[in-house]
């Protein structure tokens, strides 16, 4: 009988070693908001008005990759805008070497106010919608967004200066 108990315990122990505990998802490295960027790892903010080189360097370190492209659009209504874009959907906008705005389509980067790209319209906080030449837009506390063509989810979020043509 004792051997049977020992064997049962050994089998149970071996089986328990095969069970994995689900890991908590990694927290986002930053949160975008109406004033700029709040890194998760620091209380220091990256607000609008900061120098372009420092902002790009800081965000590149946070995302563990540099931007895929840095371009300048001289035909923006607000004046020439230089944009640093990451492949996942984040774009930072600069004018005269200063951080002035962002756009985001990356669902892994949260936006203050309870928004996230690709978030279902039904899961969004209370907002009012307006149909414009861009599509169905919304705003809350100086954070703006655009729904997908079928109005089912968030396609794009932004704050500050952008280069949209309406």
Region roles according to the model:
Residues 1-8:
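Bacterial N-terminal signal peptides that target proteins for export
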Residues 31-42, 101-110:
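Acidic/histidine-rich, surface-exposed loop or edge segments in extracytoplasmic proteins
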Residues 19-21:
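Bacterial signal peptide processing site
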